[in-house]
């Protein structure tokens, strides 16, 4: 019956479209895989196509593209250290436009980076168009086992908005799985994300046009988001460019709850379109996703600002002056003995320097590993000039200036 309805919808879209309108077909799983491989191959110096695992029922590859400047020359350690934005699609297999959004964003970043390498400098993008290949092929929300993969993640698993009964195609449901993280697709995605220095995680879905928070912050089961100042700032900036508003999620155990809760990344579902199962759009795919792609661009182009981001303004032998230019607060700031618990956005502070390193946390939420948000910066090695050691930068500068003045005066005396 569902496929009959699909044919009817196809006919309706084709015949109802105006002559000036394009009717564009969405990718299938096979064409998405082929086009993604081809896209990565066009940019061999900055992109690598890889396969992370195999789906539960049809043994289909869960494939990704990794993007970084001079990526083939980077060690695994260097690659994993880069601030990273991760984008995925089709946790729900019948939400084809979510895969399209992921693919188009990947395409945009590759094209811009090829034209201007600075667009990619110092950061990493990873894109997985389809987390649920079986559902993508079968046009089903659930995976082969009838599990809603976006209710299967360990963080807050089963708390609300889930079912304890499997749902097989064509029936859609919210079955959370037999246990948290029970599904192969979920496990593959989590393991993949653990190899990233995640700053931002966007999981694309369809069914509405808005942004979904990692967990409920209002009503029953509400839990505060520790880094809400950062979330609120980003969401306001996003609304300015995309017009998208935000809301609480409908269920627990979602991938973004795990992305923020376990991996300490700014994690959001982007509901890119209200269409779910139709294989066509009555406009261009890019046109339908234009506002959502602006939100992706915003996050990517400001990736290092997602959280606290301290900039050194001045440094002497015994102090360092810093400004937080990030979109969130910085925490536990120290250059030795003294610790400043919080530095607000745009705040300037001067702290004592008893070390050659500056350290701080760019988020207050830690995640499953204590050092996930830890930032370390090298400071200039300068000792106290009063002890006869290496003078400060300011002292050296003043000495050179004085020497220049004396030399100039002597020359003037000779000339006179």
Regions found by a protein language model. Give the residues of each.
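Short glycine- and acidic-rich boundary segments immediately preceding or forming the N-terminal edge
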Residues: 19-63
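Phosphate/oxyanion-binding active-site loops and adjacent basic polyanion-contact surfaces
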Residues: 28-32, 54-60, 95-102, 181-185, ...
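Active-site/substrate-binding loop(s) of hydrolase catalytic cores
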Residues: 79-91, 96-221, 271
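Surface-exposed patches in mature extracellular/periplasmic domains of secreted proteins
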Residues: 47-53, 114-122, 246-247
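Short beta-strand-to-loop junctions in surface cap/lid or active-site-entrance loops
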Residues: 64-80, 90
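Loop/turn elements at helix/coil->beta-strand transitions in domains of secreted/extracellular proteins
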Residues: 44-47, 58-62, 81-84, 121-126, ...
